């Protein structure tokens, strides 16, 4: 270690990334067992095979709406970093109040 802390290479903020990983089908990262665990927590006993893709679609739309609102709050505050409070306010705006993250 050269004493620069956790931050990186020093000398400016770094250049543009030459090769950026293309994010595609991340919704498939929500696995079948994860959806099954959520359903079990909600009291579901048996799950149809068609539920998994439908659940992924619903979750994708839900998170797109939350992220869009959170980014709107961030841009309004003239910041580039989305904070936990931006997400809390976005959820509150949609009628899903979340406690435990400040505010």
Curated annotation (Swiss-Prot):
InterPro entries in the cross-refs: CENP-T/H4_C, Histone-fold, Histone_H4, Histone_H4_CS
Alphabetical keyword list: Acetylation, Chromosome, DNA-binding, Methylation, Nucleosome core, Nucleus
CDD domains per record: HFD_H4
Domain of life: Eukaryota
Gene Ontology cellular component list: nucleosome; nucleus
DNA-binding region: 17-21
The UniProt record lists the keyword Acetylation: yes
Regions of compositional bias (Gly residues) in chain numbering: 1-14
Function as written in the Swiss-Prot or TrEMBL entry: Core component of nucleosome. Nucleosomes wrap and compact DNA into chromatin, limiting DNA accessibility to the cellular machineries which require DNA as a template. Histones thereby play a central role in transcription regulation, DNA repair, DNA replication and chromosomal stability. DNA accessibility is regulated via a complex set of post-translational modifications of histones, also called histone code, and nucleosome remodeling.
Quaternary structure (record): The nucleosome is a histone octamer containing two molecules each of H2A, H2B, H3 and H4 assembled in one H3-H4 heterotetramer and two H2A-H2B heterodimers. The octamer wraps approximately 147 bp of DNA.
Name by which UniProt lists this protein: Histone H4
UniProt source species: Diadromus pulchellus (Parasitic wasp)
């Amino acid at each position: 270690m050269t004493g620069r802390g956790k931050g990186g290479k020093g000398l400016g903020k770094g250049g543009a990334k030459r090769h950026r990983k293309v994010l595609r089908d991340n919704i498939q990262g929500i696995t079948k067992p994860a959806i099954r665990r959520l359903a079990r927590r909600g009291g579901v006993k048996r799950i149809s095979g068609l539920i998994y893709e439908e659940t992924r679609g619903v979750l994708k739309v839900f998170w797109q709406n939350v992220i869009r609102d959170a980014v709107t709050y961030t841009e309004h505050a003239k910041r580039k970093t989305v904070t936990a409070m931006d997400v809390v306010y976005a959820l509150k705006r949609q009628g899903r109040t979340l406690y435990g993250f400040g505010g």
